[in-house]
């Protein structure tokens, strides 16, 4: 009886060990099967998602040509909601994942283009050159007008090449052109003489009507070539009309935008407009030869009386300054 009680603990320990090994074996087997199942599922999912686009949480198939994506799919591998592009204005020419269609190309008539094939939902517009236009590049953004031949055509203009013209008779035409241009220098010379004659006439009249003698304008122009006109701008503006001032500054570098700006800044004051216009011209021109430019331009415009009036004003002022300076020097020498 004592022997049985001694063996009983050994028997129970052996049974417990056998049970534990059996359970562990079963768990290991289950884990192994679970891992194989996950690998299988992953392989299947990977195969199913090939060629799909990942957007957000899910992958989806592309929209076909002529359509765009309107809403994402809610399940992996599903098709998104696609809607057609606007006919005649938009297109897509291949399967894609975008939510936008492409704009159809415009054939600009101003660049010599016209429509060859209209835009559809699956194809862009195709342009070509208009009649009498050509384009010799691979991608034509604009077409050039065909050359018009005056002396005959060697090869007609095509969509991809310009006209080839004959050159016969070009020398004789050049001769005629020279004959036509030959009188131009003579006309210019005659016109200049007429202006000079008119100015001399005005000069004689002015000399006869004024008691005080005036200098020869040609001599004045030479002596006063570098006079600083900035101190005389207001006086000069006072003897010129607004139209005369505008005409002068336009010919001598002041652009229309600046003329309009000065006009708008002094709408109610034409006198100030003239002053500002002349000042702007003087700043652009600079001090050197500004006097010569003003006088010569007025004479060319047949405004000899005005030119001589400005000469007289400036000359009197300079003469007065010179006399005052001499007088001061004499006083200082006496002291």
UniProtKB/Swiss-Prot annotation:
Residues that bear Phosphothreonine: 214
Ranges facing Extracellular side: 26-173
UniProt xrefs under CDD domains: Death_FAS_TNFRSF6, TNFRSF6
Modified how: (Microbial infection) Glycosylated at Arg-250 by enteropathogenic E.coli protein NleB1: arginine GlcNAcylation prevents homotypic/heterotypic death domain interactions. Palmitoylated. Palmitoylation by ZDHHC7 prevents the lysosomal degradation of FAS regulating its expression at the plasma membrane.
Modified residues (Phosphoserine): 209, 225
The Death domain, residue ranges: 230-314
Glycosylation-annotated residues: 28, 118, 136, 250
A Pfam family reported for this protein in Swiss-Prot or TrEMBL: TNFR_c6
GO cellular component, one term: nuclear body
GO biological process: activation-induced cell death of T cells; apoptotic process; cellular response to amino acid starvation; cellular response to hyperoxia; cellular response to mechanical stimulus; extrinsic apoptotic signaling pathway; extrinsic apoptotic signaling pathway via death domain receptors; Fas signaling pathway
Cysteine pairings via disulfide bonds: 59-73, 63-82, 85-101, 104-119, 107-127, 129-143, 146-157, 149-165
Impact upon substituting residue 299 to N: In non-Hodgkin lymphoma; somatic mutation
Comment text on domains: Contains a death domain involved in the binding of FADD, and maybe to other cytosolic adapter proteins.
Clinical disorder: Autoimmune lymphoproliferative syndrome 1A: A disorder of apoptosis that manifests in early childhood and results in the accumulation of autoreactive lymphocytes. It is characterized by non-malignant lymphadenopathy with hepatosplenomegaly, and autoimmune hemolytic anemia, thrombocytopenia and neutropenia.
Subunit note: Component of the death-induced signaling complex (DISC) composed of cell surface receptor FAS/CD95, adapter protein FADD and the CASP8 protease; recruitment of CASP8 to the complex is required for processing of CASP8 into the p18 and p10 subunits. Interacts directly (via DED domain) with NOL3 (via CARD domain); inhibits death-inducing signaling complex (DISC) assembly by inhibiting the increase in FAS-FADD binding induced by FAS activation. Binds DAXX. Interacts with HIPK3. Part of a complex containing HIPK3 and FADD. Binds RIPK1 and FAIM2. Interacts with BABAM2 and FEM1B.
Record protein name field: Tumor necrosis factor receptor superfamily member 6
Organism expressing this protein natively: Homo sapiens
